[in-house]
Amino acid sequence: MAKKYNEDYDIRIAPEFSGQDSNLRTTSKSQKYFLIFLVAVGIYSGFQTATQYFASELQYSPYLGNAMFYIGDVPIYFPFKILTSWGDIIKAYPNLSEETYSIGYCGSAPFLIIALLIKFFTSNKLSGNRFLHGSARWANRKDIERMALIPHKLTFEDKVYNLMPWHKKKIKEIKPEGVFVGAWQDPKTGEVKYLRHNGPEHILCVAPTRSGKGVGLVNPTMLTWMYSFVATDLKGELCALTGGWNKECANKYYIRFEPAKKRQCIDEAKGLYNVARWNPLEEIRAEGSTEYCYDHKTDSLKKRICDGTKETADTQNIVTQIVDPKGEGLKDHWAKTAYELLVGCVVHLKHNCPEKCNIATLSLMLAGQIDTAKIREKYMASQNGDTSSIDDESDDSDTMDVKNLWEDMAKGLDREGKPYKARDAAIIAGQHMKDRPNEEAGSVLSTATSFLSLYTDPIIAENTSCSDFRIKQIMNSDKPVALYLVTEPTDKDRLSPLVKLFISLVLTLCASDMEFEKGRSVKSYKNKMLLMLDEFPSLGKVEKMQESLAFIAGYGMKAYLITQDMAQLFDKYGKDESISSNCHVNIFYAPLKTETAQIMSDKAGTTTILEENKSISGGGLKASTSRSMQATGRALITKDECMQLAAPVKDNLGNIQKPGEMLIFTAGQPAIHGIQPLYFQNPLLLKRAQIECPAATDIILKNGRLISEIEEEEKQKNIDKNPFEI
């Protein structure tokens, strides 16, 4: 029969390995040093005992020479004098010399016997490489401190260092901050520590539905994160629990972008509404448009007029997401030609009807409901002072033959009748539509309009008609921005293209314009940003996310991606996905699928344990037993043990009463066997969550200008009107 020695393996308690000892069960370095010490003490004790005995028998004769020191009136001699200077004296007393040596042996014997026994019992055990089959282990406190998930505890040496007056730079215990990745209970003290990650690296959390990831990771993070963030929020629960604290206490702009919710006025005098608007086409850096950027030299925002060099690129990026929301590429002729047409139409609309340039207007223009040529005529007439030709606004929507649109696009003129930099896209698209046969042109047009069907919903059309904020303002505002991207479960699939468009533009626009000074990159943003994307794979394949994770950290963006299962991630991105490999920290709750459990076990690795084999031969009094021990490999945590990780304990109403277990993997470090943190068990976090969510969303921009800039101008006008008023 076989018996496995599992003292070094326990899923609950981390084994304390030094990480430097390469022997499995042989004598350690400390044991070797102790054996050497025992032998040395034994030799010293034997010679000292023999020397003192010989001297006492000669009544400490003066002929013995000087003593090392005295204990009372008793002289203590150098222990090895019986081998050196006392040699002639010992020869004169042969009987006494035998007794002296016998006494010396007795003085050494106890220490040498102890050393031999220790050596016997340790050498009787298996020797070899301690990590023969694997070196996996659970992380201890020092490992977790090295991962920077808990603050470094000041050691005695650190405290002594701080007391020295000539050390001007003191060692400080870092205050914990960052996103929550779990909690850990110290097996020595029983103390529970929150694990918080504040580095630029990304995080992937794998947790089934109703497993406690919201109350354990998402809510605590949103109630402590002091910088900007974009959070996907299904049903608006996250917004309700964390929006109040972020606006009232964290001093952030509170923005609730819920495309499918009816816009209602909250405060007419202040122009406040329940949801914010966002127009994707206003993100295009068109020629003459305004952009607000961060100036690292002055640590402030600066206003910049765009020169139009990035207009075509921005338009193509937006149209790509509209035409190919699944990220599968433009596979057929109709999709490719529709893409070309939409790029040209957006550029044309941007320069001929900039005040109404949105996707709903774009679909109306393609339906022949907007005559851009007439708009140009009226605008040019108004600029020349001819007001007689200006009709009601309803005339802007007069129907027109769509063929006239292709003619107008092919001219490449803006509403002032002048050519513009990005006109090539409009000219080419218009000319190609003119040259196509009617049937083909009709098919291209119908394909293009089919991609815009989402924006025929009047609620979505209103909420995307203009922008109360721009994406770059999330990281480049005078204070951080808390942006909640809210979708109802019934609208999740329908709104998926718009949500993916928003996220893709965040990754595109916020990861640009890196500057360098003295051979190093400098910060190109005012506030760093967290992307908290819950149920990330349910959005569909966001190819831009998979491509961007490798470099967006350098632009101040940190992604926190949450999925229910690894199979869900594989379904959207394939087995060779690069999302998990670009996430420095991987968090796992108890899985429901064996595929995910196997991944967890593989990540934890293999450890080396001892296996004892015992065989019995014979019987009765003649029975004999032989034992042998060998090293064998074992998964640090097996697949079935992963699936049996303790789940949260819930009451009959489904409320969590006791946290469950979790595994945290950090690149290059041992795995952490942790417990789930619960925000409502922390009085401070619970108090923050009880702050009422604002009814109205904040507005950062109005007509493309910062609200703060407009208010400052109005304030200055009032001062100029009343120069003597205090």
Please state what every model-predicted region is.
Residues 165, 182-184, 279, 353, ...:
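Glycine-centered flexibility motif
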Residues 25-26, 121, 126-157, 275-276, ...:
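Short, exposed beta-strand "edge-strand" segments with a Pro/Gly-rich flavor and a Y/T-containing core
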